[in-house]
Amino acid sequence: MLLKRYSLRCCCLTLLVLLAMTNVLHATTPEKGMFLVADEQLKDPRFRNGVILLIQHNEQGSAGLVVNRGSRLSLSAILPKDSSLTGDGRTLSYGGPVDPNTLLALVKVRNYPPEPADEVVEGLYVTGVGVLDEWTDFSAEVVSYRTFVGYTGWAAGQLGAEIQRGDWSVLQADA
């Protein structure tokens, strides 16, 4: 019961933060940088009450990160002891059920992103945790970051069908 209340609070808090930080418009066609909000009738427990940030959407398919679920994995338990990312006691967020061996990071930077990195919305990039750990300009450039284990994925056309079925609401964010 306590875990359910915590999850609901976490979901509500995440949505409030996202709404406070962005101008939100409803959209019907998904694009990279948009949020997917799970419909309350969505039966898959991995996505129930979920909010997903699309980090990729093209003719080959879509990928995203669940932004409102934590995990019990600590970053320090996975990365080497000499990693620059293990000192602050962060835990990994649950990014989704696809490839739980993948470690990704969303990074908000001042000027220049790590290489390689893909811009999701203006100033917010997705990259591998290893790239972030090896980035020499980390302390000078990073405003904030969040790490994820796994991601969500859809085959070509699959996400569009789920949106038409009413499984997801699409929110356009303008950072």
Where are these regions (language model features)?
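Generic extreme N-terminus detector
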Residues: 4-6, 25, 61
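A short aromatic-anchored loop/beta-hairpin motif
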Residues: 27-175
